[in-house]
Amino acid sequence: MPGQTLASLATVMLVSVTAYANPASLVPGGVDSVSGSDQFLAQSRVNVIGAVDYEYEHDTSTIWRESDKDTTADPLGALPRHRDLGFRQDRHTITPRLAVGIFHDTFFTAALPVVITQSRELHLDTGVTREGSSTVQSGLLPAAGYDAQDPTTPPSGDVMFRGPTRHGIDQIQLGLGFAPMNQQRDETKPTWKLGAELRLAIGQVMKFDPMAPGANSGVSSGVHELKLWTSFDRKLDWVEPWVQIFWQVPLATTSDSLFQEPGFGAVNTAKSQIAGVEFGCEISALDNVTERNRISIDIGGKAIAHFEGRDYSEMWEVFAFAGDSRGTGPLILDSDPVKTGVQATSYPGISNIENYLETTAKLAVRAEIGPHVRFVVGADIVWKTDHVITFADAGVDLPTCGSGQTTHCETTNNDVVNPGTVEVNPLHVGGIDLVGHRYHSEDNFGIVLGVSGQVIF
């Protein structure tokens, strides 16, 4: 009888240790060679995790424009900025996920986010008229506006631009992870995981053609990226704090990606890098250890640093509209600044974006129904710091040529980018990149609602 009691107590202790809920605590353990007293642990290992996530995202922001024509502005004060447009985007995404244990806390992961629908539009901001919009005055949009879903009819109300409805796949995410520490194996230690994830761009690249606005409904950036991450989790009775840190960097692009290197004096042409931290504390509201039923509340946050680089902004489709080389728009580029005349090429739409910080408040309710089924319902509130979204440099001022030097230098000794030389950045457009003409994204606010279901074996 004492032996049976001890065995039962050990079983309950092991079950309680494995009754985790948040993702930082789950380790698909894979196959272990165990025997004797460790056989129960082998049977309780999490080897396969299948999940399906659904997210609805709603984002808004205000587009401001710098002005160098305000005669009433204080010449010693800050550069005047004026309201111009309001932005709204809605997106629905479903993501199937799979994590498979390989051997002794080493696991493989895969995910395939599928954008079901994405819609976005720009409207006149408070107090702005169609004729008074600086975007209209600069010739980027007609005063009547443009509706990509019905190009022959101007948009109604205060809508200035409505983009095409988009859907599809951006990247497939393939990863490998390892847990140097696992609380399931040793309850005196936290769960510590390390991982790397390769994000391969496989979907249709997101582009905009004013002559055929409905021809491209893609959502992919056409950029292959690498994500490195680590996470820590520690269950302490009825509370479970956790944290995850990550860094994501572009590696290469597909042949039709907009993130191409044009040469000459172009700098910062790659997609923006990001790095962030996500954290939370899961609090048990109901924990039935015997039947493996549990309800918990997870309160946390997230901070993501977006580093300077090129990316899709709120205005990217408008910029592509105004930079179509088949027309006469103000954003048409010169692909070869050294040749005489203009070698017209279309503005891709993506632009250089200033560093900014994204912060998120997170709340989730998690439920475990037995040892194999889990559900999560969550809501996020997202803020982004104000930042400039047209930020391309005019080029690179090369050093003066030394004795016998003929390349990567200039013959004149000055501190400016000389027009008509290799110093010029072909992606720079004074009409939106020069100080006094730049666009700003401000008052960013977003809401994310999500539901997730997991099956664990």
Task: Describe the role of every protein-language-model region.
Residues 1-32, 416-426, 457:
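Cleavable N-terminal export/targeting peptides
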Residues 22-23, 35-48, 105, 121, ...:
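Short loop/turn motifs that connect adjacent beta-strands in outer-membrane beta-barrel proteins
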Residues 69-70, 253-457:
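Outer membrane beta-barrel transmembrane domains
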Residues 48-58, 110-114, 192-200, 243-249, ...:
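Transmembrane beta-barrel strands of outer-membrane/channel proteins
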